[in-house]
């Protein structure tokens, strides 16, 4: 028979160890995987002709397309969007709409405002913050594993 008083007395106010809060190895690896395309997109920060420059970047460096979802805190490479013109399912692993449609997407989501108004200075740093925030969901999993180890 189990002594529940002894078992309950062994509880601590927290199960968190130092690695519980953020898995920075994962964050840095995710950012590193797209660092070069992000730095290409950095050229849009503060530009006055962002739409034309974005279209030129997409044509010359189509691999930059895969960076756009994480700028919206999305890991999936497909994003649904609706407006007065209809429903769109944008793909970011390869273009399934025109460059002009992706330009409209950037404008309507606010990403162009973020860049052209210099709200952020560096997309690599910005995405590091986004990845850190998204990793909070991983904290739930880490918490479950830590509890499992203790029980």
What are these regions (language model features)?
Residues 1-139, 143-146:
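Nuclease-adjacent, charged terminal/linker segments that flank catalytic cores
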């Amino acid at each position: 028979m189990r002594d529940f008083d002894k078992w309950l007395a062994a509880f601590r106010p927290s199960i968190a160890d130092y690695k519980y809060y953020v898995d920075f190895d994962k964050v840095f690896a995710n950012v590193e995987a797209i660092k070069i395309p992000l730095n290409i997109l950095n050229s849009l920060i503060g530009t006055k002709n962002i739409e034309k420059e974005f279209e030129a970047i997409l044509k010359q460096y189509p691999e930059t397309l895969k960076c756009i979802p994480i700028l919206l805190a999305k890991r999936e490479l497909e994003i649904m969007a609706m407006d007065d013109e209809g429903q769109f399912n944008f793909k970011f692993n390869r273009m399934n709409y025109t460059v002009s449609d992706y330009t409209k997407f950037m404008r309507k989501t606010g990403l162009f405002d973020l860049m052209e108004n210099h709200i952020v200075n560096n997309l690599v740093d910005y995405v590091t913050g986004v990845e850190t925030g998204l990793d909070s969901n991983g904290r739930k999993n880490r918490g479950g594993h830590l509890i499992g180890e203790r029980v």
